[in-house]
Amino acid sequence: SLSHGEGKNAFYALGSGPARALATKVKDGNEEPVEELYKELGYRDHSNETAIVMEVDKVPPVEVIEKIAKACKVDASGVHVILTPTSSLAGGMQVVGRVLEVALHKAHSLHFPLGNIIDGTGTAPVPPPHPNFVKA
């Protein structure tokens, strides 16, 4: 998750996209992926720019963009942000579009050998936009 500040001015969003594959942290003197899954899979990505999709209805503060840039080792001008409020059609599509990703993550968490999965598909209903993000 991406967060900054407290109280009424607090910012919080879930993020997805290429930035998650680029983001690293230093732990015990070693650089490693922020995402545990990428660490387990031994996957690393490198780029001069990145993109992130945020499930949120307001523009993130500069501090959040700087945090993403630092973790991804890119200049802040190379961070491309797409905002998809959950209450919008784009937000609903973004959530529904991850149905296969969630299934594969579940298979991984159950220690099913992912190399045995050759192909996959998923379907889910697309909810209509709703002004209340909880109901959306």
Swiss-Prot record:
Catalytic activity, EC: 3.5.4.27
Coiled-coil intervals: none
Localisation per UniProt entry: Cytoplasm
An example Gene Ontology CC term for this record: cytoplasm
Gene Ontology MF term list: methenyltetrahydromethanopterin cyclohydrolase activity
Pathway(s) this gene product operates in, as recorded in its UniProt entry: One-carbon metabolism; formaldehyde degradation; formate from formaldehyde (H(4)MPT route): step 3/5
Enzyme class: hydrolase
Keyword match Oxidoreductase: no
Record-given protein name: Methenyltetrahydromethanopterin cyclohydrolase
Annotated source species: Methylococcus thermophilus
Organismal lineage: Bacteria, Pseudomonadati, Pseudomonadota, Gammaproteobacteria, Methylococcales
